[in-house]
Amino acid sequence: KLTDFNHVAIDGTIKKAYNSNNNVITKKETQILLDYFNGLPVSQEMLEKLHKPAQKIFENKDMDVEDKIELLYDIETQFTFTGQDKVPVNDIEARFMKGKKGNFMIAYNIQSAVDYDTKLICAINVTQNPTDHYELPNIVERAIKNINTKPKYISADTIYLNQISLSYLADKKIDGLIPNRK
């Protein structure tokens, strides 16, 4: 037996999505295109003022009107879901997140659970949440399912220290090794 998975370490990282920060569409542009493709009156001037990503959707010959409307409704749903005012065109499920250098980028939050002793990956979870605050229960559940055992210890950095994480660990009877905030 290689390991007992006695101690599992949790961490998250922000990974840039396949989308430029400039390749985004705004709420207003989405609504203009939806109005246009649904047959409502839209001025030529408004269509000409669309930024390049919105123009590409408007002019795309490979998509029929129904596909464009479906894409635009999906984008509109992302505005509602995220509260953000811009959505990436190439990857509408990615989110603006703060990177390690403090810059904002279109990205995903990747959570990992790794066996402390052997460095074997127990679980990976890709999320749209821009911070790690409430990710501990999800990634630990995935790890327990994958390794088919409950670790005795879970270690994580300070960002995971909150009532939700602590209650989860207490309910599971797992010792949490999470430092206090400074």
Where are these regions (language model features)?
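Polybasic low-complexity intrinsically disordered regions
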Residues: 1-174, 179-181
